[in-house]
Amino acid sequence: MYTIRRTKDFEISIKRLARSGIKISLKKKIEQTIDLLASGKRLPESYKDHQLNGELSKYRECHIKGDLLLIYKIERESLVLILVNIGSHSQLF
């Protein structure tokens, strides 16, 4: 089990999502995704989980639902899951 660490960008983005009136079902999907990652389990193919390229190559990205993306990093040596940011493709890139 990984310890979860949230970056400031992630905290700001998740608050923005909450203010936008996020549906309970989507909130649960976000929590389930984070729980799966923290448990060390592989995400199902539907999440389109992949490593990013270029300057962001040390991070991974998964599609939580539609255009809602989660950028994260797993530090296996220290057993830490870092939640980097969350949002739409246009918000993140």
Q: Residues of each region from the PLM?
A:
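Basic, Lys/Arg-enriched alpha-helical interface segments
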Residues: 1-66, 75-81, 90-93
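Catalytic Cys-His active-site segments of thiol-dependent hydrolases/isopeptidases
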Residues: 83-85
